[in-house]
Amino acid sequence: MQLPAMSCSPSQSSAAAAAAYGCCQRILLASTSLPATGRPARLGLKLRSTHSLQIRNRRFVCQAMTETEPDGDGNGDEEKEELGDDASSPSVYSVTQENGSAESETNADNTKDETVNTEPLSSSDTVQNIDGDATPASDAQENVEVVDVAVGSPLPGMKQQLDESVRIPKATIDILKDQVFGFDTFFVTSQEPYEGGILFKGNLRGQPAKSYEKITNRLQNKFGDQYKLFLLINPEDDKPVAVVVPRQTLQPETTAVPEWFAAASFGVVTIFTLLLRNVPLLQDNLLSTFDNLELLKDGVYGALVTAAIIGVHEIAHILAARDTGIKLAVPYFVPSWQIGSFGAITRIVNIVRNREDLLKVAAAGPLAGFSLGFVLLLLGFILPPSDGLGLVIDPAVFHESFLVGGLAKLILGDALKEGTKLSINPLVLWAWAGLLINAINSIPAGELDGGRIAFAMWGRKISSRISSLAIGLLGISALFNDVAFYWVVLIFFLQRGPISPLSEEITEPENNYISIGVAILLFGLLVCLPYPFPFDPSQLTDFDL
């Protein structure tokens, strides 16, 4: 239907425009009126998109030709209110399609008005489809991006310390990719979001230590202390990965019992077991210990020597940690009925900077303990037993250690014969106990000193395999040795790891530190392995076939 063109003079008032609108409305109503039968009483509109809505919309422009005439239906004011801001233009109107209402005189059908709006739909609008169901109009307009995240933390061996997951927003991830990382440091190719952070895969450029420093500075400038960066090795493909986590997920675990109280309690028990270990009479009958406490004074000298070796071990850890900026928790001395003590368990509280720093701290304890223990062991073999302190033993006891047995054969010579009792200075056994405590802590397993040394030298993947092998061999030894049995139980429940991630795990330590680490592992192995050769050369014929 085409309306005839109309014109009006510029002097006509806005009332004429309203009258013209009423005229146009009556023409439109006449053209869109539906019969009472044959078509539905209500006109159903199905809007598929904003584009189709605009195509179906009808807009009529009416220009007044005559003087103002009265509005026939009197609905002009109400419809102008519905039009809102669009009604401010007197010559352009959005026209309402009506199928009849209770107030309409031209149609007797009881149907409600259907309004077509030419404005774009907002996200809160709904549109009725042909079946009368309401559907959101924003389905075709909303661009909501849903990011799936993996459970837990992207860091190896880290647990989520918070009750609720802390996710990094997508806007922050984009800033990290585009502005924090870059071609000169770490070129990101993909990312894997987690509840506790995000893991970036890509290509590392330049030296890892320098790249880490650059990325950390950019991260600090963009977000302050909100996030923490880690450069690790992906165990799946041995390629570098970058991990960014919120610092609040790195909060240390809290314990119900204060650390100093627990450490003091373990320390008191350890002192008692060190004294008890050096009193053979009480070892045979532990139940009589509290009835014969005065006998414990006989074990003071031996307890002091062993405690000195353990103490030097822990002091070396503390000094090395202070030099590298590593914070250590209070050491827990573990008591042992067999050798007096298993040494101390010392947790690392903060995040270690790199593998070389970890190697310095982990190797410092065994290096100091082995050094003091070895010197005291040599003195024990060299010094003759003094009056009242000589200890008579069977030389077969030296077969339990390759190092001690070899030194005994080298120093004592022909005096060392199978089946012949031998009087030695008790300093040998006291120092031997200290060496054994250092040796079992140097086993490359879990979070022991040896496990940390292996991790620092060869990385997480290789050290985890060595740790599994060491624990397996230790478990086999536990079938024949009670010390090994208790030690493997202790490792499994308290020290099995994994080791907490370092800030930068890619850079290897310097060769001189690696040499020290290898020497410590070998020395501990010599202390623990048995001496297989007979002390008397004449007995070699017993092994001939």
Curated annotation (Swiss-Prot):
Q: How does it sit in the membrane?
A: Multi-pass membrane protein
Q: What is its EC number?
A: 3.4.24.-
For molecular function, the Gene Ontology terms on record are: metallopeptidase activity
**Can you cite an annotated GO cellular component?**
chloroplast membrane
Pfam families, alphabetized: Peptidase_M50
Query: Residue ranges under compositional bias (Acidic residues)?
Result: 68-85
Q: Which domain of life is it from?
A: Eukaryota
List the keywords (alphabetical): Chloroplast, Hydrolase, Membrane, Metalloprotease, Plastid, Protease, Transit peptide, Transmembrane, Transmembrane helix
Report the record's Gene Ontology biological process terms. proteolysis
Q: InterPro entries given for it?
A: EGY1-like, Peptidase_M50
Location of this chain's protein in the cell: Plastid, Chloroplast membrane
Membrane-crossing segments per the record: 256-276, 300-320, 325-345, 363-383, 426-446, 473-493, 513-533
- Give the main localization category: plastid
UniProt transit peptide range: 1-63
Q: Which PROSITE patterns match?
A: ZINC_PROTEASE (PS00142)
Q: Where is the composition biased (Polar residues)?
A: 88-109, 117-129
Give the region (Disordered) as residue ranges: 66-142
Q: Which family does the similarity line name? A: Belongs to the peptidase M50B family.
- Purpose of the protein: Probable membrane-associated metalloprotease that may be involved in chloroplast development.
Q: What is this protein called?
A: Probable zinc metalloprotease EGY2, chloroplastic
- What is the scientific name of the source organism? Oryza sativa subsp. indica (Rice)
Its gene name is EGY2
